[in-house]
Amino acid sequence: MRFSAVSRHHRGASIDPMTFSEATTPDALTPDAHTPRLLTCDVLYTGMGGAQSPGGVVVVGETVAAAGHPDELRRQYPHAAEERAGAVIAPPPVNAHTHLDMSAYEFQALPYFQWIPEVVIRGRHLRGVAAAQAGADTLTRLGAGGVGDIVWAPEVMDALLAREDLSGTLYFEVLNPFPDKADEVFAAARTHLERWRRLERPGLRLGLSPHTPFTVSHRLMRLLSDYAAGEGLPLQIHVAEHPTELEMFRTGGGPLWDNRMPALYPHTLAEVIGREPGPDLTPVRYLDELGVLAARPTLVHMVNVTPDDIARVARAGCAVVTCPRSNHHLECGTFDWPAFAAAGVEVALGTDSVASGETLNVREEVTFARQLYPGLDPRVLVRAAVKGGQRVVGGRTPFLRRGETWQEGFRWELSRDL
């Protein structure tokens, strides 16, 4: 099955390379408001059930009249003016994991250990409210169906919570690897969270993000996850992004631990996680046995995992967000999507920051994933970008069904042939 790229060049319309273009036929240039239009595509996802291929939607004026297989729609609406809508017709995709406050960074593809000091640390002065607002503006312009944003600075949370043009979850990020500081750090985080809960409005809601299993002490991790579970706050945790994270939990050392800033960490990993590393210990197993998976956090990346890890995630009912372009650019490995899908784990797509993911456009993430997983049914990718994302960020998936309003944002056209 192939997506095909079709572009539009009528009425002087320009094409934004950051978005998917639309496609029309000459018959569509001057449509009668009461003449049905049959829009066809390679993959149709109506927001219900699974996606189908091929697909089509009949639109009359600005209202959806029917959706289904093109042959059946041609039979039901023989006088409909047919046009190709593009590769995909579906509700807008969700960017389920990103860092909007890094939107002023330049994209750089570098090995993970080079990227952190040369990009993240060197460019830290670029982070802040202005960058986050610019990133949020980009998502709005792209017509994103929702966002899962990791927020580090309180002033960024204040600014983003006030926006009414986005939906999804803003996850307040907390990190501190010293167990003796856990109560103090938790108390400060709780003070912020309780104030922000009073500022929530329809659209963006509040969440919590303990950074990683090795930058948050075992005590703080448990305090945060228990609090989130009790308060109904969604969680996101970065887990198993780089191969050396797995090595670190097995041996207590390796490049990831050795390249840390010593003044910011205890002397040993055992002090951080409250147990000795071991050959069978993984970040996922650690979180599970600590009781954190019981809070059903969304786990981000999950590239370097074992079959037992996948089984634990499935049993706990945790969702996973994969960021294919970022993982590729930082040489982290490839997320085992088929294995997670076989285990019944809900998968969503995110871009990570523009510094590693290049853009905030999830449609481009779908394009890249289609190349990365040639054996994976593209219907799975589309559903993950929509339904999987909405389930992660707590949104409602729009439906393409009879009587619903048609939106041009339902047209997805890939930027290149695959």
UniProtKB/Swiss-Prot annotation:
<dbReference type="InterPro" id="IPR011059">
    <property type="entry name" value="Metal-dep_hydrolase_composite"/>
</dbReference>
<comment type="pathway">
    <text>Quinol/quinone metabolism; menaquinone biosynthesis.</text>
</comment>
<keyword id="KW-0474">Menaquinone biosynthesis</keyword>
<feature type="binding site">
    <location>
        <position position="99"/>
    </location>
    <ligand>
        <name>Zn(2+)</name>
    </ligand>
</feature>
<dbReference type="Pfam" id="PF01979">
    <property type="entry name" value="Amidohydro_1"/>
</dbReference>
<dbReference type="GO" id="GO:0009234">
    <property type="term" value="P:menaquinone biosynthetic process"/>
</dbReference>
<feature type="active site" description="Proton donor">
    <location>
        <position position="241"/>
    </location>
</feature>
<dbReference type="InterPro" id="IPR050287">
    <property type="entry name" value="MTA/SAH_deaminase"/>
</dbReference>
<keyword id="KW-0479">Metal-binding</keyword>
<dbReference type="InterPro" id="IPR054418">
    <property type="entry name" value="MQNX/HUTI_composite_N"/>
</dbReference>
<keyword id="KW-0378">Hydrolase</keyword>
<feature type="binding site">
    <location>
        <position position="238"/>
    </location>
    <ligand>
        <name>Zn(2+)</name>
    </ligand>
</feature>
<comment type="similarity">
    <text>Belongs to the metallo-dependent hydrolases superfamily.</text>
</comment>
<feature type="binding site">
    <location>
        <position position="352"/>
    </location>
    <ligand>
        <name>Zn(2+)</name>
    </ligand>
</feature>
<dbReference type="InterPro" id="IPR032466">
    <property type="entry name" value="Metal_Hydrolase"/>
</dbReference>
<keyword id="KW-0862">Zinc</keyword>
<feature type="binding site">
    <location>
        <position position="173"/>
    </location>
    <ligand>
        <name>substrate</name>
    </ligand>
</feature>
<comment type="function">
    <text>Catalyzes the deamination of aminodeoxyfutalosine (AFL) into futalosine (FL). To a lesser extent, can also deaminate 5'-deoxyadenosine, 5'-methylthioadenosine, 2'-deoxyadenosine, adenosine, 1-(6-amino-9H-purin-9-yl)-1-deoxy-N-ethyl-beta-D-ribofuranuronamide (NECA), and S-adenosylhomocysteine.</text>
</comment>
<protein>
    <recommendedName>
        <fullName>Aminodeoxyfutalosine deaminase</fullName>
        <ecNumber>3.5.4.40</ecNumber>
    </recommendedName>
</protein>
<feature type="binding site">
    <location>
        <position position="97"/>
    </location>
    <ligand>
        <name>Zn(2+)</name>
    </ligand>
</feature>
<feature type="binding site">
    <location>
        <position position="211"/>
    </location>
    <ligand>
        <name>substrate</name>
    </ligand>
</feature>
<dbReference type="GO" id="GO:0046872">
    <property type="term" value="F:metal ion binding"/>
</dbReference>
<dbReference type="Pfam" id="PF22039">
    <property type="entry name" value="HUTI_composite_bact"/>
</dbReference>
<dbReference type="GO" id="GO:0016810">
    <property type="term" value="F:hydrolase activity, acting on carbon-nitrogen (but not peptide) bonds"/>
</dbReference>
<dbReference type="InterPro" id="IPR006680">
    <property type="entry name" value="Amidohydro-rel"/>
</dbReference>
